[in-house]
Amino acid sequence: MKLWEKNFEINKEIERFTVGRDREMDLYLAKYDVLGSMAHITMLESIGLLEKDELTQLLAELKNIYRLCERGEFLIEDDVEDVHSQVEMLLTRKLGDMGKKIHSGRSRNDQVLVDLKLFTRHELKEIADEVKSLFDELIQKSNQYKDVLMPGYTHLQVAMPSSFGLWFGAYAESLCDDMLFLQAAYKMTNRNPLGSAAGYGSSFPLNRTMTTELLGFDSMDYNVVYAQMGRGKMERNVGFAIATIAGTIAKMAFDACLFNSQNFSFVKLPKECTTGSSIMPHKKNPDVFELIRAKCNKLQSLPQQVMLIMNNLPVGYFRDLQIIKEVFLPAFGELKDCLQMAAYIINKIEVNEHILDNPMYDPIFSVEEVNRLAAAGMPFRDAYKKVGLDIEAGQFTPDKRIHHTHEGSIGNLCNEQIQVLMQQTFDDFHFERMLKAEKNLLG
């Protein structure tokens, strides 16, 4: 069944090519198509395009379809083009001509837009929850190991004293900034495109404010042409947020792989969290971090993939935009999987509390000695030269006590302030409006 079907049949090869993976991708959107339809028909009844009894029956049947989606039993039949057609067909089978009325004042263009926005904001909430969970694990580890020193590096050369408190805490604070990107993406997403129809509005007296409130959007995409222009732009902006989070996790995974190697031995994974080799019986490989790194590096390409699909399109709808679904919709599950696994493995990771007992790391205390001499009155440059010559002569015996007390340093991690930043950003999403609207629609 095709919503646009007339008195001729399309070539089967053309149909195969143009439908592509739409049925597969549209399963991500199914329950959101139902929610959008529930809001739309409620509005249609309010402007006299549906009778009250018709609305009651349609809403009841849409709730049944929603339950099918929740149970994973909703399917798009082989001869049906997309999720919108499948939902309308199920309603028509059950309720006859009543089911054919739900498309009044609507195009598949604004229908898929609202589906994508409802899906995306839900997924952004789930990602925010997972980011917060990983953040909490990192802060806990930072506090647990705040006094355990490790070498800091520049140019992959040992540089200055650092600590596991700083290392874990640095990635926690990075996630705070990443959440700002996520929040901006959420705010741009959480606007109602419904009522823009094919991109030029409708002659029906649609009440767009009503559907905005019913669906729990913050506001609407006011200009109907811009609503359609937003297709692809939303995905690109969300893609940047996903890529930013993925960048933090990929870097952390790289560090962990490096620190887990025998040449570093800074951290250790429990053996049940490693994999082995088919030929080398001693191997305990950090595959989990390697796969997190690879998956997150792939996710960092998402905004570029979206841009390359849409960057030469003029105003209006084009079928090119369908291809964005194939890279965009699965990305949320991939990122959530990486976040969940990262939180799990960070919880299990063990740290070496005696790294700096090895004299090979003594030079990292050189700056501490320079500063001590400078504080005692020696000119800084003279102190710098003296310590450098002592190291070259093998005469440097460092005092390994650390005296860092300023904000954000080894002795003053500022984890409490970082936690406040994260909580403020998380609270500013205001997910409760979205959740309340969905609950009200479903009764």
Predicted regions and their residues:
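A helix-coil-helix interface module used to build multimeric assemblies
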Residues: 1-201, 206-212, 219, 275-276, ...
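Glycine-rich cofactor/substrate-binding loops
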Residues: 1-36, 97-98, 265, 280-443
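Generic, well-ordered alpha-helical scaffold segments in large soluble proteins
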Residues: 40, 61, 65-68, 90, ...
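A general structural motif at alpha-helix termini
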Residues: 58-59, 215, 271-273, 360, ...
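Alpha-helix capping and helix-loop boundary segments enriched in small/acidic/polar residues
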Residues: 103, 108-111, 155-162, 166, ...
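Short amphipathic alpha-helical segments with heptad-repeat character
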Residues: 117, 121-128, 132, 139, ...
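Conserved helix-loop functional segments at active or binding sites
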Residues: 144, 181-184, 188, 217-224, ...
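Acidic, glycine-rich loop-and-beta core segments that form the ion-binding/anion-interacting portion
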Residues: 215-303
